[in-house]
């Protein structure tokens, strides 16, 4: 949503509109959004501003169809914690935008910042739409076989359940 090229930003909204319509047609209630302002370029204040503007438009489109958008917490500084995701959830202030935390990415962020994954999850209280269960090791975010890394799955699942999460999706690598 935040690309510096206006044509790319416009195309992102067109794709989002089609995704929301498809979700509605299929009865899908939640779309997971990758928490990036930009992916193929360097982020800036302008990309973050454009991201927020287009995010607002996307959430308004989703609300019309009763589809919830949930940010996946990613591996980049832009949105690698629930707390960072919540800045945008609070900014947009619409019940059709929430957080879909990736506990592997959260675990790596917590290791980097010296913080607690469970405390970070708490910052999303009332706004967690589902939980993405994925394994990681410090500094590596993909292709880690389940239960060979450092994610404390029992603790994060318990915390998610305590916070009202009832939908869990796993990402497993073989």
Give the positions of each predicted feature.
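Active-site acidic/histidine proton-transfer and metal-coordination neighborhood
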Residues: 1-99
């Amino acid at each position: 949503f935040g690309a510096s090229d206006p044509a790319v930003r416009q195309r992102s909204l067109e794709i989002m509109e089609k995704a929301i319509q498809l979700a509605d047609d299929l009865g899908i209630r939640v779309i997971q959004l990758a928490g990036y302002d930009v992916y193929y370029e360097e982020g800036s204040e302008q990309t973050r501003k454009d991201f927020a503007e287009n995010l607002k438009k996307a959430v308004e489109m989703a609300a019309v169809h009763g589809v919830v958008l949930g940010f996946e917490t990613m591996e980049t500084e832009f949105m690698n914690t629930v707390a960072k995701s919540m800045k945008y959830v609070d900014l947009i202030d619409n019940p059709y935008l929430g957080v879909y935390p990736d506990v592997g990415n959260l675990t790596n962020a917590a290791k980097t910042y010296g913080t607690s994954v469970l405390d970070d999850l708490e910052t999303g209280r009332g706004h967690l739409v589902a939980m993405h269960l994925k394994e990681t090791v410090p500094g590596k975010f993909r292709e880690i076989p389940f239960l060979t890394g450092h994610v404390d799955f029992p603790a994060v699942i318990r915390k998610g359940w305590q916070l009202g999460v009832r939908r869990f999706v796993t990402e497993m690598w073989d």
